[in-house]
Amino acid sequence: MSIEWYAVHTYVGQEDRVQDQLMDRARRLGMYRTKIFQVLQPEEEAVEIQEGGKKVNVKRKLFPGYVFVQMDVEDDDAPGELGESWEVVRGTSGVTGFVGTATRPVPLSPEEVQRLLTSVGVAAQPVVEEAPRIKVDLKAGDMVRVTSGPFADFSGVVSEVNAPQAKVKVLVSIFGRETPVELDFSQVAK
């Protein structure tokens, strides 16, 4: 796996649409955060003076006709060959090609990446994979004990489990009343 930044040609004025469509396609095809990581199109805020002297704040593209994609273009099964992610980017409506030769995109140099990320106010950082999902054997109606936080050592009944957020809602008896408390999975035990 070789994750690099690439400049992608687009039709001028289509940068926003290309960015949205590309991220949508990456998510739908299961490539987001595995093959296609980020799509950027640096902008700057400017003040334009219109007729009559009225000042208007506008966003202006720093690189009209380009978006920048952080991705792995190689085929996992054939190192050195271009993979499906390359086809996904090239096949996105509004994309006219990669910067490079007709058969091989050329990645940006580290200096170019640093300038690009600085222009959008992001420090260059290595890609961090998503944290693994925590699997917890909890369901509504389970009796649990709170192990940490302000309700430590209280017991309660699980009323709701939110697995994507790794949260659980527990009904804790406080002063004789059932009070819902939202906790992280790590704060409760059966």
UniProtKB/Swiss-Prot annotation:
Gene3D superfamilies, A to Z: 2.30.30.30, NusG, N-terminal domain (3.30.70.940)
Gene Ontology cellular component terms for the protein in this record: cytosol
GO terms of biological process kind: DNA-templated transcription termination; regulation of DNA-templated transcription elongation; transcription antitermination; transcription elongation-coupled chromatin remodeling
Annotated TM spans: none
Keyword Transport found: no
Superkingdom assignment: Bacteria
UniProt KW keywords: Transcription, Transcription antitermination, Transcription regulation, Transcription termination
Pfam families given in the database record: KOW (PF00467), NusG (PF02357)
Coiled-coil parts of chain: none
Residue ranges of domain KOW in the record: 141-165
InterPro entries registered for this protein in UniProt: KOW, NGN, NGN-like_dom, NGN_dom_sf, NusG-like, Rib_uL2_dom2, Transcrpt_antiterm_NusG, Transcrpt_antiterm_NusG_bac_CS
CDD domains from the UniProt entry: KOW_NusG, NGN_Bact_1
Cited PANTHER family: RHO-INTERACTING TRANSCRIPTION TERMINATION FACTOR NUSG (PTHR30265), TRANSCRIPTION TERMINATION_ANTITERMINATION PROTEIN NUSG (PTHR30265:SF2)
Alphabetized NCBIfam families for the sequence: nusG
Family: Belongs to the NusG family.
Task performed by this protein: Participates in transcription elongation, termination and antitermination.
Identification of the protein by name: Transcription termination/antitermination protein NusG
Gene label: nusG
